[in-house]
């Protein structure tokens, strides 16, 4: 099967790449290959009672699947260049912050509305830190919480599922350059873009 774009991985980078492509170039045929499960099928067997530790599932539902490793996190999104990544080194601090705010807007539009945005800037706590020679990094943090984070991811998936072809439980085994694009190999077959 041939696609215009193939994305490997349905973590945040893959999800937002697919989101942008469907909004900016809706005619493109986009496929996303993910080694893990759809969000609705991601379940870890650890229950704290019968199963207390990792049993080494062939596909880890905590680390893999739609939403990536952060799907079941507490949904904190940092909007800062001071920590958490180095995107600003490639595109500049202003544009990096603009992109972080853009992602925040998408999250809000997909179920995150009503959540709080916290900031360390201008707080009494920051003043106390400075008085004690401690240096608190400035950041705005959107705290969605685990349940709302899941809801946001599910809503984004619902928006994308009819515009993007998702291949879940389909690890990519190899990628090779071709004369007119790339060949992507899985156990189920070969795909091109």
Task: Kindly give the residue locations of the regions a language model identified.
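Beta1/beta-strand and adjacent pyrophosphate-binding region of the FAD-binding site
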Residues: 1-13, 31-33
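Core beta-strand elements of the Rossmann-like FAD/NAD(P) dinucleotide-binding domain
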Residues: 1-3, 187-193
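Aromatic pocket-lining residues of Rossmann-like dinucleotide-binding sites
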Residues: 17-21
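Short beta-strand "acidic-cap" motif of Rossmann-like dinucleotide-binding folds
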Residues: 27-34, 39
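Conserved N-terminal/central alpha/beta ligand/cofactor-binding core
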Residues: 38-42, 46-163
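A general beta-strand register signal
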Residues: 71-72, 167, 185
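A conserved short coil-to-beta-strand element within the FAD-binding core of flavoproteins
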Residues: 144, 168-182
């Amino acid at each position: 099967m041939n696609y215009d774009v193939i994305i490997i991985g349905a973590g945040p980078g893959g999800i937002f790449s697919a989101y942008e492509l469907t909004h900016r170039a809706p005619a493109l045929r986009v496929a996303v290959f993910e080694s893990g499960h759809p969000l609705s099928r991601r379940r870890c067997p650890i229950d704290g009672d019968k199963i207390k530790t990792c049993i080494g599932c062939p596909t880890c539902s905590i680390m893999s699947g739609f939403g990536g490793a952060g799907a079941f996190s507490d949904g904190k999104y940092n909007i800062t260049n001071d920590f958490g990544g180095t995107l600003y080194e490639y595109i500049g601090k202003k544009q990096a912050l603009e992109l972080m705010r853009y992602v925040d807007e998408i999250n809000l539009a997909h179920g995150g509305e009503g959540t709080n945005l916290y900031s360390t800037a201008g707080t009494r706590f920051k003043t106390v830190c400075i008085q004690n020679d401690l240096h608190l990094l400035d950041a705005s943090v959107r705290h969605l919480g685990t349940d709302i984070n899941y809801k946001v991811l599910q809503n984004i998936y619902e928006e994308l599922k009819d515009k993007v072809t998702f291949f879940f439980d389909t690890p990519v085994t190899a990628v090779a350059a071709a004369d007119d694009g790339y060949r992507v190999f899985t156990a189920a077959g070969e795909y091109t873009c």
